[in-house]
Amino acid sequence: METGGGQGLPVLLLLLLLLRPCEVSGREAACPRPCGGRCPAEPPRCAPGVPAVLDGCGCCLVCARQRGESCSPLLPCDESGGLYCDRGPEDGGGAGICMVLEGDNCVFDGMIYRNGETFQPSCKYQCTCRDGQIGCLPRCNLGLLLPGPDCPFPRKIEVPGECCEKWVCDPRDEVLLGGFAMAAYRQEATLGIDVSDSSANCIEQTTEWSACSKSCGMGFSTRVTNRNQQCEMVKQTRLCMMRPCENEEPSDKKGKKCIQTKKSMKAVRFEYKNCTSVQTYKPRYCGLCNDGRCCTPHNTKTIQVEFRCPQGKFLKKPMMLINTCVCHGNCPQSNNAFFQPLDPMSSEAKI
């Protein structure tokens, strides 16, 4: 009996060791490497006010889960809305429910709103209190229309008897327009409206940055904002570089259809209008696909770059730096874009 028990123990340990790698590989299977091939060709269409975020694997765009919805590492909660994935006492890597983090109340126009509470200060906006700060989204879903090939001169007008304004296009085609090549891009959504000072009469509005004007080399992108003391709508510009033109060849690695993001192996200096950046940078670039998809910036930041110009002059310009890129099938039908030439001495113009 004792001998039989001694032989059974090693067999049991062997079975446990054999089962353990299976569990590990099962967890890893949830995040395949590489990501290519498992993401939908089209980006997700999320409900108004719901952002698209990268899943827990950093592979695919998914609609951020909202309060009370189920969540998991592959289906993250809307962190920008103050939500987190509550997985219960164990707090493991399984499914959970999106919950609101406890935070401070908000005061707007003499009214007190609890953290997470939603209200409408007017028919045009829906606002939410988020840990002492108020964020608003337009209910009219018009956003701010940037000039484009089909509507180079947009203008917003009021409609009698209706809350929301309406965009119309002025047929002013006598103005000379630039001929930059538009980069492949995903459609941009209008950002939320930041209302942090209840005493101000101006509700700040800012659009997303537009697509870079060039698919390779130095270009620029634009956005519209009224974030200034005069509360006036102005168009801002920033420099951008999706990739160097000498790297305009798709990846030919075996089994690799796309390279989303790649970092420069050596420090480089940016060049703009015969000016060279004072500092060196190791920027990230968007790769290319050989299956017809486009790779464009997904998450970016803006920095101030100082350039040294001829005759000892110096120039500072805002410039986009890429954090991550995404590959998708939402490619433009034409390479013609309507951009006004960029003023080398200014990054802002009134609308």
Curated annotation (Swiss-Prot):
Domain of life: Eukaryota
Keyword Mitochondrion on entry: no
Gene3D superfamilies tied to this protein: Complement Module, domain 1 (2.10.70.10), Thrombospondin type-1 (TSP1) repeat (2.20.100.10)
Leader peptide range in chain numbering: 1-24
GO cellular component: cytoplasm; extracellular matrix; extracellular space; gap junction
Keyword terms, alphabetized: Cell junction, Cytoplasm, Disulfide bond, Gap junction, Glycoprotein, Growth factor, Proto-oncogene, Secreted, Signal
Residues carrying covalently attached carbohydrate according to the record: N274
Stretches assigned to the CTCK domain: 258-332
Cystine bridges: C31-C57, C35-C59, C39-C60, C46-C63, C71-C85, C77-C98, C258-C295, C275-C309, C286-C325, C289-C327, C294-C331
GO biological process, one term: cell adhesion
Family, similarity comment: Belongs to the CCN family.
PANTHER family, per the entry: CCN FAMILY MEMBER 3 (PTHR11348:SF8), CONNECTIVE TISSUE GROWTH FACTOR-RELATED (PTHR11348)
Function comment: Immediate-early protein likely to play a role in cell growth regulation. Its overexpression is associated with tumorigenesis and expression of a N-terminal-truncated version of CCN3 gene in chicken embryonic fibroblasts (CEF) is sufficient to induce the transformation of CEF in vitro.
Protein name: CCN family member 3
Record gene name: CCN3
